[in-house]
Amino acid sequence: LAHPIQLRKQNRAQLRNEIKNLADMGLDAIEVIHSDHRESVVVMLDEWADRFGLLKTGGSDFHGSNKLHIKLGFAQSRRRIPRSYFDAIVARLRKRHLSRDVLNPSASESIVINSHC
């Protein structure tokens, strides 16, 4: 779920309930770090991601030279997106892929993940 704060709920309780409902329906991840998120929002979303079993993502919202104050790979020009976010996504993808192979041993599809970031 990108830009979860933009769901524009009236308060944090409503936002939390909406994110929980989405997680219950199969949501995989939530954008915890974003260039518009204050530290208190990052902490809140991080806690909710843990509580609801969601992967964590982050982004700078970099869209090129039209936003000079935003740097690629950094949120708020000082916070880097943790490598652990990427590693957790890769681990879940590998687990799903392995589960698929166990359920369907004849599956010929493969997953290739380049971890040279």
Can you say where each PLM-predicted feature lies in the sequence?
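Charged catalytic cores and adjacent phosphate/nucleic-acid-binding surfaces used
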Residues: 1-117
